[in-house]
Design a protein with these regions (language model features):
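Outer-membrane beta-barrel "beta-signal"
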Residues: 88-97, 170-197
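Solvent-exposed loop/turn segments connecting transmembrane beta-strands
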Residues: 39-49, 76-83, 125-133, 163-170
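Structural signature of outer-membrane beta-barrel domains
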Residues: 37, 72-74, 119-123, 159-163, ...
Length: 197
């Protein structure tokens, strides 16, 4: 029984420590968010699907900077014009430490974070005006580590686009689900070498 309790304590300590190892200076974050996805179930129902691949480098512990690409397609109902959305820009993330005031770690297997982005994006509507503008967004999220290097993420984010043309500010609040792979620098170099060979 003592061995079982000791093994449990070691496992819990190891899992708690893995929530910090991923977000250290020099590591890489690669992942994607499924921005929104819905399909109309009624006759003539529409759909909205978007994906956001992203990559970032930890410039210091708990702080990552990188870039993203936004791609999406939207059709409100059958017969309505199809809308294609796109964007590219920079992003930043700050992971909250469990010791910071007001921060509690859910099950000790993940981390809360704040994410912000700025870039250029737009939309192209079938047989209608298209626009390009300044994309921006910010919001809190949580990364739950299912393994030491893979996190499932949820993010509530305010997203806005200030059009450069006749279109003004468009904004909404999105709920994002996705995943991220956290690679130590040595592992990232191995992957890059494997791709070259």
């Amino acid at each position: 029984m003592k061995k079982l309790i000791f093994a449990g304590i070691l496992a819990a300590t190891g899992l708690a420590a893995t929530a910090n190892a991923q977000i250290q200076k020099g590591n890489w974050l690669v992942g994607s968010k499924l921005i929104s996805s819905n399909f109309g179930l009624n006759t003539g129902g529409g759909y909205n699907i978007a994906i956001q691949p992203q990559g970032a480098y930890f410039i210091q512990d708990n702080v990552a900077v990188g870039g993203y690409v936004d791609l999406g397609i939207n059709k409100v109902t059958n017969g309505s014009p199809t809308e294609f959305t796109y964007g590219v820009g920079g992003l930043g993330r700050y992971y909250l430490s469990p010791g910071e005031k007001g921060v509690d770690n859910l099950l000790h297997h993940g981390r809360w974070f704040l994410e912000g982005n700025v870039g250029i994006g737009g939309r192209s509507v079938e047989n209608a005006d298209s626009t390009t503008g300044l994309d921006f967004g910010a919001g809190p999220g949580y990364s739950y580590f299912i393994t030491p290097n893979i996190g499932l993420e949820g993010l509530v984010k305010y997203k806005g686009r200030a059009g450069f043309g006749s279109e003004g500010l468009n904004s909404n609040i999105t709920f994002n689900l996705g995943f991220s792979i956290y690679l130590p620098t040595s592992k990232a170099k191995e992957v890059a070498n494997d791709v070259r060979n």
